[in-house]
Every structure is written in C-alpha cells, then in structure tokens.
C-alpha cells in the first residue's frame, strides 16, 4: 500500500506496538484533528497528512501539503493559530487542559519571537547601543506583548474549532478509525460537514 510506504519511509511513522489507552487515544486524535481543522479552515487544501501514529516516542502529527512559508503577517499568525489549535481542541471537546501540548507551546513561543522581530518591531526598538542587547524593561515589555498575542491566537483557534465542531469530531472519528488521513480524506470529510 502506497500510503503505508509513505508513512514509514518519508514520515518515519510506525504502527505502534504498545497499546494506547482508548481515552488517551481519543484526546490525541482530537488534538491532531484540531491542528488539521484549523489549518483547513484558514487555508483549504493546506494540510497534507494528519495521523495518530507515532515517531520516536511521540504520538500523532500533522504536515502541510506543500512547502509553505508565511508571505505576510496574516499567514504567519495563521501558522501560530494552527500550532495552538491542538490544545484548544482538547479543551473544547473534553473540557480539560491538554498537558501533552508542551512541544506545541514551545513552537508557538518560538514563532512569536520571530513575529516580534519581523512584524511587531520588537527587534528594532529598545536596544542598548553599548552592548547591543535589549534592556530589561524592553524584554519585559516584549514578553507581555508576546503573551497577550499568544492568548489572542489561542482564543482564535478555539473559536474556529467551536464554529467547526462537526468537522473536528468527524476528523477525530476518521483518525480513530484509520489512524491517518490524507489531504483528500480531509476534503471529503469537510464536504460532508457543510
């Protein structure tokens, strides 16, 4: 099967030998589904693959359908929103904080550092000329801006998922049934939810 070969060779995703608790697997599936749903809502056709399979001890993942780079601030913030969507999805469906989302939070934090330098002016103001470092006051100010923007984008992801809950649940169901969904599967699911 070509999909199986793609998963193993390109993405290095193996069928897991260990049994994952069914409740935990449902949360993993909604987490991954949330990334895919937000990506598809913001940029239809942009998600290439979403899976609950694992790689190096990490279960679940998602990849864009093609190499896409943010061309502007809006696209960049869409990427951060998609990154935060897994956590928002678990909160929406299960009413609990997704404590497994630390890698996503770290990624969102890194993306926000880039956003501040390139789009928010954080890289151009507050520099102390003597040692070419930011002042403590400026660092604190930048962290406050970043934190507020992350909260805003998390709420944006939550709202997108709330407005597309049937799509989210259908993708979760598809992941629980098939482990992996491709771009074409997501398109069919989305069409059935409209």
Regions found by a protein language model. Give the residues of each.
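Soluble catalytic regions of large protease machineries
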Residues: 16-30, 36-194
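Conserved AAA+ ATPase small/helical "lid" subdomain
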Residues: 1-7
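Non-transmembrane, extramembrane segments of multi-pass ion/lipid transporters
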Residues: 8-14
